[in-house]
């Protein structure tokens, strides 16, 4: 197992990461998402983000290093996924996405709530 970058504060099981990709896809189709670190940062600062997704393989890590602390400060749940390429694909863009934010989960509200609960349990460990 490769060492995680310093901004990764907790381990996300693969099963949960797959649910996160599914949530991003569903929210993109039936709700509203923001893609990329600048858009994600703005959504958190404006209080619009319901969940922030951060890729673990971002290089240089400074691109997303501020997001966990900003989310903590604003009370926004956040979760990690292993691949910025997969996150970009789930978000419907042809390039990788270092991060994304769920603004409106659309038809995936239950999945959003389930993921937030799982993240809270992971962070409590």
UniProtKB/Swiss-Prot annotation:
GO CC annotations on file: cytoplasm; ribonucleoprotein complex; ribosome
InterPro entries, per database record: eL8/uL1-like (IPR050257), Ribosomal_eL30-like_sf (IPR029064), Ribosomal_eL8-like_CS (IPR004037), Ribosomal_eL8/eL30/eS12/Gad45 (IPR004038), Ribosomal_eL8/Nhp2 (IPR018492), Ribosomal_eL8_arc (IPR022481)
Pfam families documented for this protein: Ribosomal_L7Ae (PF01248)
Predominant cellular place of this UniProt entry's protein: cytoplasm
PROSITE patterns from the UniProt entry: RIBOSOMAL_L7AE
Compartments in which it is found: Cytoplasm
Molecular-function GO term, any one: structural constituent of ribosome
Domain of life the protein comes from: Archaea
Biological process according to GO: ribosome biogenesis; translation; tRNA 5'-leader removal
Keywords: Cytoplasm, Ribonucleoprotein, Ribosomal protein, RNA-binding, rRNA-binding, tRNA processing
Subunit: Part of the 50S ribosomal subunit. Probably part of the RNase P complex.
NCBIfam families in the record: eL8_ribo (TIGR03677)
Its biological purpose: Multifunctional RNA-binding protein that recognizes the K-turn motif in ribosomal RNA, the RNA component of RNase P, box H/ACA, box C/D and box C'/D' sRNAs.
Family: Belongs to the eukaryotic ribosomal protein eL8 family.
Name of the protein this chain belongs to: Large ribosomal subunit protein eL8
Gene field: rpl7ae
């Amino acid at each position: 197992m490769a060492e995680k970058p310093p901004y990764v504060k907790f381990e996300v099981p693969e099963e949960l990461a797959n649910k996160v990709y599914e949530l991003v896809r569903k929210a993109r189709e039936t709700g509203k998402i923001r893609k990329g670190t600048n858009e994600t940062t703005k959504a958190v600062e404006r209080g619009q983000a319901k969940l922030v997704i951060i890729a673990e393989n971002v290089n240089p890590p400074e691109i997303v290093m501020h997001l966990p602390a900003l989310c903590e400060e604003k009370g926004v749940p956040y979760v990690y996924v292993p691949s910025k390429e997969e996150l970009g694909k789930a978000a419907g863009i042809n390039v990788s996405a270092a991060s994304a934010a769920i603004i409106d989960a659309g038809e995936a509200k239950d999945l959003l709530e389930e993921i937030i609960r799982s993240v809270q349990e992971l962070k409590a460990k």
